[in-house]
Amino acid sequence: SGEWELGVHIADVANFVETGSEIDLEAERRGNSAYLPRLVLPMIPETLSNGVCSLQEGVPRFTKSAFINLDKRGRVMSTRLARTLIHSRKRLTYLEAQALIEGDQKLARQHTRAEPAYEDELLDALRRADKLARIIRARRLRDGMLVLGLPEFELVFDEDGRVIDAQPEDDAFTHTIIEMFMVEANEAVARTFSDLSLPLLRRVHPEPTFHDIEELREHARVVGFNLPEEPNRTDIKSLLDATRSSPASRAIHFAVLRTLTKATYSPAIIGHFALAGDHYAHFTSPIRRYPDLMVHRAIDAFLDHTENGRKVPGGKGRARLRSTLGGDSRIADEGRLLEIGRHCSDTEVAAEGAERDLRSFLVIQFLAEKHLGDELPGVVTHIRPNGGLFVSLDRYLVDGMASL
């Protein structure tokens, strides 16, 4: 029939972290895990995140699942949430999975971290996942999803923790497979609560303001692209697509990134501009994001009153369900959601800033020791009206101002 069923299974952290417990209070305070170069500051103890909350190969694990039915063009027809118990058949790295999709088992074995045994059922599942992700991505691009073509590099360290080089991160499509499936699950959860008119901590991304757009319009004019005074998402997507393969790609895509507002956490239903979605929440990383853990608790309330998601009533029954869930403490009220949303938005900014600053420090330390006085290739990403150029180095992705 060409129809698909996608199942996305996420570790049931809420099953092990009780509301109001010491672990929960500390997780709330931290807001999220912080990923610094060579150091992770976890939101919850590693005995949980690397133990019973880790979906390990060959081990049964409690999960929450989103089941999404899609038509042959990737349009969502129905969704269902449930508590589940899964038994992971195989752990794969991204490059290993990509090689298997491409039919190269020899290359796959070079990237494995587990026993390199690949059953036909696994290979077929990978190929189907690849096909479905491409269908979903094509649908999202038609809907206006923005895709920034910005390079990413990972630092290479010696045994003493000092940077000795940088190398491009792999661009395997398997990263996109996971991304597309996670986005579908996040939307399915957000839609479920929107359909019931229930409050939820959402991930929101407002439209950029037109004041911020003016600088982007100037960048676009330099490369011969005329953005209207009040561009919409389609206009910005056209600019990104038109410059994706040009020498100006990085500068333009950086300019778009600077123009876009920062996504935050809020109970407001204002959608996600970059994803071209009306309803979005974070559900897929409760190990490392407190908003996801709050969403999981809200899902627990929903599942308790719908026979594990199997019986979601309509009509008057839906109104009764809404009233019942509205009195369940696991579904926080808007005041509490606003408070947590602001806090977790702030902790996210702090964690990202710490990662960025430490990375820049380590790279600059390396450049000062090994490349002082050398000429290095870079891209001009911004010109100050009163003089000076901002340059981003190609290989190390650090920015600096060159005075004129």
PLM features per residue range, with description:
Residues 1-404:
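Electropositive polyanion-binding surfaces
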